[in-house]
Amino acid sequence: MTGMHDTIFALATPPGRSAIAVIRISGPAAHAAPALFGAACPAPGCFQVARLLDNSGMPLDEALVLAMAGPRSSTGEDVVEIHTHGSMAVTAAVLRMLGDAGGFRPAVAGEFTHRMFANGKIDLLGTEALADLIDSETDRQRLQAWRQLDGALYKPVTGWREEMVRLGGRLEALIDFADEDLPPSVEAQLRDDSNALIRSIEGVLDDGRIGEQVRNGVTVSLLGPVNAG
């Protein structure tokens, strides 16, 4: 991944003809981007309608400009979004002017998400869930991705870690006081609690295998006589 201190930009909506196109800019120089088009940058957390001008001063489009200040933004950096009409000519001109201006560069694939992760806006499980949500094609895939994005796996993992620490402390105490006359129930309870933790982890792993099938689909072979229907 290239420099984290660069100001990057990219088309955040699918390319092609559409009603609206969103150009996202993130980095230390993001709030200077609207000035390239003869527009003022709104205050952080605000938006305004602005007429964008090209390098010759001719109108390019009328757009909605939003500004967010780091760390209170999606990437944790200063962010500007320019919402233009979804004309391929307009978006190409805006991207070209940003690239030619100096101080801005096109983002590489996944770089906005990488900055979200690097700045603590999302964890590793969240980045995987976000990718799954974007790629989802069915309601079940969407719901599974959203559950993971909402912490469905993070929460039990955190609980397992806390339980392991507690069990480790109890096991150390049992070893340290092995020569004491401890009741058998102490060791039995530790064993039961450890087995309960193992069953909890195994249950989530089993669900994970089902989740892989939901995410990737299932390969099915249809077998039968030729021209059977």
What residue spans do the PLM features occupy?
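A glycine-rich (often HGG/GG-containing) alpha/beta subdomain
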Residues: 1-143, 147, 151
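Conserved G1/Walker A P-loop phosphate-binding module
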Residues: 6, 17, 21-26, 36-40, ...
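Short secondary-structure transition/capping segments
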Residues: 97, 152-160, 220, 224-226
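Hydrophobic alpha-helical segments, principally membrane-spanning helices and signal/leader peptides
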Residues: 105-108, 163, 209
